[in-house]
Amino acid sequence: MPLVARPHPPALPHGAIREVLPGVHFVTGTVRMAKPPLRFSRNMVIVREADRLVLVNCVRLDTAGLAALDALGKVTDVVRLAAGHGMDDPFYRERYNAKVWTVAGQRYTAGFDANAKDVYLEPDVSMGPGTELPLTDARLYTIRASPPEALLVLDRHDGTVVAGDCLQNWGKTDAYFNWLARVMMPVMGFIRPHNVGPAWLKACKPPKEDVRGILGLDFANLLPAHGEAVIGNAREQFRAAIERVS
């Protein structure tokens, strides 16, 4: 299928890259929606293996941010976990010649219509149960939502999960929210700690057994695409929200 050419979205305001676990970095940036005109935060996770860097849930960085990223190592791979993310993946592929990995069944469409005809990027790898991932200690936990989503499970630091839209940890709004998002998103159920993503749950309709199956994973830390990192006892902190899914 021919790709629809489009310019890379610009770098939007973001914070500093910070190491939340040895070899695992986290940076909070911005996403901007047109209708309704909401602006709120999103996170990128940077996982280091030797001198290689794997970016998960990409957020485009500004010039200073890219210099800080380059100081950490060489970007070789980009991993997309949530179908609602990925708009900055083409930028990192072009800049670093990075290999792009997505969950099988996802497509790069503009906006939130996963079934739209036009796509703006084709991945290098569509990840399934038997896919050898770009991190030697990683595996994928796939959720059969529509479109599908996955968790990246790292066998390090007593188990570390990187999440897309399914698990969120917005205990409060932050500096990247505009006034409308500060008003609307609490009412919509987003601003809660240790939360199952409410819009994702409603729109993507994951099987409850797949969501509850997350509790069968062994992890102490959770790095979400939205909200603060949870370092220590993460599975138990998310247990109540996951068990409420029906």
Regions found by a protein language model. Give the residues of each.
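Short His-Asn-centered micro-motif
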Residues: 56-59, 79-83, 103-104, 143, ...
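Generic signal for short, ordered secondary-structure residues
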Residues: 26-29, 71, 193
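Short, well-ordered, mixed-charge alpha-helical segments that flank or form enzyme active sites
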Residues: 87-88, 109-112, 147-149, 169-172, ...
